[in-house]
């Protein structure tokens, strides 16, 4: 494993490489997390944007969607627990961009918590 891959939080090396191959000048990868459920393949966080792989197309087609932090209006943790319960008990987040909401589900609440906090940092 190369030094860059060791320093970036990621679930799958091939997803990290896919994000790294499309970086802009001066852009760095923060984390790449594998998603579960239908539609989303992974989410990447960089110093400039959120990158989501959308696998909801027919056949073997997929899209890579780049969302600049400046276009994100809000980010939410999706939970079936009350505020009095465990707030980050779920592994899902919702990212609102205009009238569209991207929902991403993870294996583990810590990943959702990290993604939420990184996005919140860049949109605040």
Name each model feature, range by range.
Residues 94-113:
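Canonical phosphoinositide-binding patch of PH/PH-like domains
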Residues 1-44, 107-109, 114, 121-124:
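Anionic N-terminal interaction surfaces
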Residues 78-81, 120-124:
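Short secondary-structure transition/capping segments
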Residues 32-42, 46-92, 96:
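Phosphoinositide-binding peripheral membrane targeting modules
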